Swiss-Prot record:
UniProt-recorded Gene Ontology molecular function terms: G-quadruplex RNA binding; poly(G) binding; poly(U) RNA binding; RNA binding; translation repressor activity
Native source organism of the sequence: Xenopus laevis (African clawed frog)
Function: RNA-binding protein that acts as a translational repressor. When overexpressed, able to disperse P-bodies.
Keyword RNA-binding in annotation: yes
Gene name tied to this protein: patl2
Places the protein is found: Cytoplasm; Nucleus
Recorded family membership: Belongs to the PAT1 family.
UniProt tissue specificity: Oocyte-specific protein. Expressed throughout oogenesis but is not detectable in eggs, embryos, nor in adult tissues (at protein level).
Subunit record text: Interacts with ribonucleoprotein complex components. Interacts with cpeb.
Comp. bias (Basic and acidic residues): 49-59
Protein name, entry field: Protein PAT1 homolog 2
Alphabetized UniProt keyword annotations: Cytoplasm, Nucleus, RNA-binding
Residue ranges, annotated region (Disordered): 42-75, 337-366
Main location group: cytoplasm
Length: 733
């Protein structure tokens, strides 16, 4: 490198190439410095520092003169003549011309040339040494005055900007930038001009991934130069770039012009080199907050917070730009926010994670299950279900909540804390139904009819209402059957209470059994009285026999027999046997008499020999209207023949047992006559007319062997088809 012709400063090279980045760093640093001043106040050294700075500016530095033919006309230096008797301040202009292979940097001075051999005394100037060794320069010490190497006077930059055709892209990508130093150092007007005028920054894309800042920062190696020695620029961190890259086409840039920020005079003395300085333009967050006009002291400038503090190495973190924060409105009572707080707020305003967006974008799998018409139908049905005759019972929690809410609102209105206003209430419909019974239309020969069924009025299956009708109409319309069914329903409800008490007996303590037993017996006696069980001659007038004509009546008697006393049960058995022919004739349609066989068999097994003879003789008496015996009809009915076999089998057990029978006088003769009569009738009945019994006892042939000959026994065996029994001895004829 020829020092006589040109001298390349690495710091100027960085400033010229990355001017936009340094401008952004300056704005953020100025925000922190102004926050420091507002927070901690001004130092006493603020009055002494400008004097020291002016002394440093008085020492000139000679720079080599560059060829003037490389300088464009648009960037000719404007020389100002000062009338002061002090040492003249030199105007320094830095011209950067990027070429394909190399970069030429030329520096023009105001008439003085630096020799190749520089005195050690001049290099001993503290300001020069600070610039050469990368230490904070005067501009970094006073954050109120900012110069990033783009221009010293903003009027010059405005001239360049006007020549660029009001295009922000040309301002950003301008290849040649000049820097001038004037003699206006640390003037209050310049500071006020920086503080009060906040540049408008258009929103642009953040293209930092492909920028030179991300690919290489000229990192930690120290730059060598024969005239300056080892020098390292001030380390800085990569940041977002607010302006677009020069490689982006002009059509992609904002259509409105970019207004460059106004800055005060440069604070560099002639013997100082612009380095990486602390730049701190700060704009208040609220428009009604004025910016302080006092300059920052070096002591306050040194105070940095968090990631904004100087670091000896490149930090992997970089601060977000202020464009996202320009849309954020801070409350009026908040005057200023620390930059770290602004960074946190900007991070909170970023969009949510991609996983949440994916979840929100998933289609609802149940969205199309019901059509709109079906949804409306369900809503109407649910609204119908809300109707209640007792809201405090059906909707207790909401009613209690609303009562508490009304009480609270009334207290607030009474105390004057709020205006009287009727709160919103979800009204539960209250329906008061009239207690009316509408009888269904009577249809002849039916138990009732199905009424119109709705959700308000369920259907009625039976209309059991009494009507005053003549006897002929009663027989014709079957009114008697309806009356019997009504009577059976009434007795059945009473019997259900008896069964409920019986179920409770197994779960209560033994000391309470007596009480429950008395209660149960009382209810059973009431049912027995209601049935009116008594001997009768006219079967049509007996309510009990009429009850046995319907299936529900037979089932009721079968379930009631185990709860009755023995004498009550024997009376029912006797009535059934006496009127067996009547019951068999009326049971031809339903054939439900078989439900009585089990309970009656239990009663028969408990009869004595005398009682058994009395019940069996009822089957051998001829009918009043004919000469036929009930035995003839009993052989043709399953319930009748089963009942007959059960009576004969129990008699054989009594005769075969060793237990004393205690018979009365003439009981054996009566029993023998009864067995002969049954055998005679059984032998006369054809086999085809006989039915199979519910149960065939095995001791019937033993009974007949006591009184009949061998030929008659074989004939009866063939008809009854009794199982094989041990050999027996027939009675000789």
């Amino acid at each position: 490198m020829n020092l006589g012709s040109e001298q390349i400063l690495p710091e100027d090279f960085y400033l010229a190439e990355e001017g936009a980045l340094l401008e952004e760093m300056a704005e953020e640093d100025e925000e922190i410095d102004l926050y420091n001043e507002v927070t901690f106040g001004l130092d006493q050294e603020s009055d002494e520092e400008p004097v020291k700075l002016e002394d440093d500016h008085t020492k000139p530095i000679q720079m080599p003169e560059a060829p003037k033919e490389e300088e464009p006309e648009a960037l000719q230096p404007v020389k100002e003549a000062k009338g002061s008797e002090k040492a003249p301040l030199h105007e320094v202009k830095i011209v950067v011309e990027p070429h394909e292979d190399h970069v030429d940097l030329s520096i023009d001075s105001g008439g003085h040339t630096m020799n190749s051999t520089m005195d050690d005394s001049e290099l001993g100037d503290p300001a020069v040494m600070k610039a050469f060794h990368g230490k904070p320069t005067l501009e970094s010490l006073d954050s109120a005055v900012v110069d990033s190497g783009i221009g010293s006077t903003w009027s010059e930059l405005d001239t360049d900007y006007d020549q660029s055709g009001m295009d922000s892209g040309l301002w950003e990508a301008s290849p040649k930038v000049s820097t001038y130093a004037t003699g206006q150092i640390l003037e209050d007007k310049a500071i006020l001009r920086i503080m009060e005028r906040a540049p408008y920054l258009p929103p642009t894309n953040l293209e930092f991934l492909g920028s030179p800042l991300q690919r290489g920062f000229m990192p930690s190696q120290r730059l060598q130069g024969p005239e300056m020695g080892a020098m390292s620029p001030k380390p800085y961190r990569p940041r977002f770039m607010r302006q677009q890259s020069p490689l982006v086409p002009r059509s992609m840039r904002p259509s409105y012009p970019f207004t460059p920020p106004r800055r005060g005079p440069s604070v560099f003395a002639p013997n100082q080199s612009p380095g990486f300085v602390s730049q701190t333009p700060f704009r208040p967050m609220s428009p009604n907050v004025s910016t302080p006009t006092r300059p920052m002291t070096p002591k306050m400038v040194r105070m940095h917070f968090g990631p904004m503090s100087p670091s000896p190495s490149f930090s992997p973190f970089f601060s977000p730009m202020g464009n996202a924060l320009q849309r954020f409105k801070v409350p009026g009572h908040v005057t200023q926010l620390h930059p770290q707080h602004r960074r946190i707020l900007s991070q909170r305003q970023r969009p949510q994670s991609s996983s949440r967006r994916q979840w929100e974008s998933r289609p609802d799998p149940y969205a199309s299950l019901m059509s709109q018409k079906e949804k409306e139908w369900v809503i109407k049905l649910q609204m119908i279900q809300l109707q209640s005759e007792n809201p405090h019972l059906d909707d207790y929690y909401y009613q209690a909540y609303y009562e508490n809410l009304e009480r609270k609102l009334s207290e607030e209105e009474f105390l004057g804390e709020r205006k009287k206003r009727e709160p919103t209430k979800l009204v539960t419909p209250y329906i008061q139904k009239a207690e009316t019974y509408e009888s269904v239309v009577h249809i002849e020969g039916s138990l009732g009819q199905v009424a119109v069924s709705t959700c308000y009025s369920p259907r009625r299956a039976i209309d059991a209402v009494s009507y005053a009708m003549p006897d002929e109409a009663i027989k014709a319309l079957g009114y008697q059957r309806l009356r019997v069914l009504k009577h059976a329903e009434k007795v059945f409800l009473m019997f259900l209470e008896v069964e409920e008490l019986a179920r409770k007996m197994s779960h209560i303590p033994e000391e309470e059994h007596v009480h429950f037993q008395h209660k149960q017996n009382y209810k059973v006696q009431r049912i027995y009285d209601v049935l009116k069980i008594a001997p009768c001659h006219n079967e049509e007038e007996s309510e009990f026999l009429q009850l046995l004509q319907v299936g529900k009546g037979k089932k009721l008697v079968a379930r009631l027999l185990p709860f009755l006393r023995s004498e009550q049960a024997r009376e029912i058995l006797l009535l059934v046997v006496q009127h067996l022919t009547f019951l068999i004739k009326n049971d031809s349609a339903e054939e439900s008499l078989s439900v009585l066989y089990g309970p009656l068999k239990t009663i028969i097994n408990g009869l004595s020999f005398t009682e058994l003879i009395g019940v069996t003789q009822e089957l051998t008496r001829p009918l009043p209207e004919s000469n036929d015996l009930p035995l003839t009809l009993a052989f043709q009915n399953q319930f009748g023949i089963s009942l007959l076999y059960c009576l004969l089998s129990h008699g054989e057990r009594l005769l075969s047992s060793d237990l004393p029978m205690e018979p009365c006088i003439g009981d054996f003769e009566k029993w023998t006559d009864t067995v002969f009569l049954v055998a005679k009738e059984l032998s006369h009945v054809s086999k085809s007319s006989m039915v199979e019994p519910l149960f065939l006892p095995s001791n019937l042939l033993s009974l007949f062997c006591r009184y009949l000959d061998k030929q008659t026994i074989h004939k009866l065996e063939d008809k009854m088809e009794c199982p094989v029994i041990p050999p027996y001895t027939a009675v000789p004829s």
